[in-house]
Amino acid sequence: MTLMMLIALVAVTLTACGGGGNKKEEAANNATKTEANAKTEEGKEDGGAITAEGLMETKGGFMSIATGGTGGTYYPLGGALSNILNNAGVNYTATAQATGASVENVELVTKGDAEIGFIQNDVAYYAANGTETFDGNKKSSLRGLCCLYPEVVQIAASAESGIKTIDDLKGKKVAVGAPGSGVEVNVKQILDVHGITYDDLGKVDYLSFAEAADQIKSGQIDAAFITAAIPSSAYTELATTHDINLIPIAEDKAKELIEKYPFYVNLHITPTEYKGQDKELSLVAVQSMLVVDEKMSDEDAYNIVKLLFENLDTMKESHARGGDIALDKALDGMSIEVHPGAQKYFDEVKK
């Protein structure tokens, strides 16, 4: 039995006994395995179906993957990534940890309580630069591994409100997410390039999208912002029972936004995404991404991105958004310094 296997066995034994430990052990003890994690145990018995050639030598070790809520997108993708790492034959012991998502994951990774974190690239930018949510709390050790898929800023407006453009939000009752949340920052930035402030709105409500959807249904508000992968189940549910307009952003305004905040990307969604949408629309999105701390070895960072991009089928099987992850888009929207180990892999595949 190798030293790392012995350590892993001891850690499991302590967990079963309810023993205490340092923060990393607590994170492991509190982690909830996804279905993909559970399948990992079976995969280890038969070797799994993971492509793992050409990896760099490493000591392996425990990898806590900070994701998001169990009902979100990050959690199943984190489970799939843990499955890939556990079956790579490099003695990694990985587990997906349910968390409060982006902001919390930055803290977990930079404090050493998680090795890998799923976050939005705008949050990564704020953390690395000490702005917005991280004003006075700069996380200079945060490093990027890769970008994954777009999380689209969507504006849902009741048809009866008459809102068709962002300028039409003036004088209307609008939900902007929780105070200080990533969604609210997106709202302020988008309104800013349109010359709109909160004072121009009829009413500003700080609501989650689930709360906002209920108030759109009851007529208490006219529109709500949500930043999420498309299609969003919450938006889909709302559009199924009520006439809803998805509000586009003009391409010239999208360009202006991207010039000012380079972590955004412009994209077009097809008319088939949501009920009631009858034409292609221009929207903007931030990118989901994987981050680590600068202390992670080059070898581990290299192995993680190599294993991820050479086993994308496993990611796709865990969640539809896994199918949006692509090597040729891995650095699109990268908002912070790339870990040198990850950069080594990207440089190799370009040759």
What is the predicted function of each stretch?
Residues 135-148, 273-282:
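A structural signal for short loop-to-beta-strand junctions that line the ligand-binding cleft
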Residues 18-22:
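Bacterial signal peptide processing site
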Residues 60-88, 92, 96, 150-218, ...:
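Bilobed "Venus flytrap"/periplasmic-binding protein-like clamshell domains
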Residues 23-65, 160-173, 240, 340-343, ...:
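Immediate post-signal peptide segment of exported/extracytoplasmic ligand-binding proteins
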Residues 204, 211, 218, 228-246, ...:
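An extracytoplasmic/periplasmic, membrane-proximal ligand-sensing/linker region
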Residues 79-83, 95-136, 155, 210-215, ...:
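Pocket-flanking alpha-helical
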Residues 13-16:
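C-terminal motif of bacterial Sec signal peptides marking the signal peptidase cleavage site
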Residues 152-163, 257-262, 286-299:
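A bilobed periplasmic-binding-protein/Venus flytrap-type ligand-binding module shared by bacterial periplasmic
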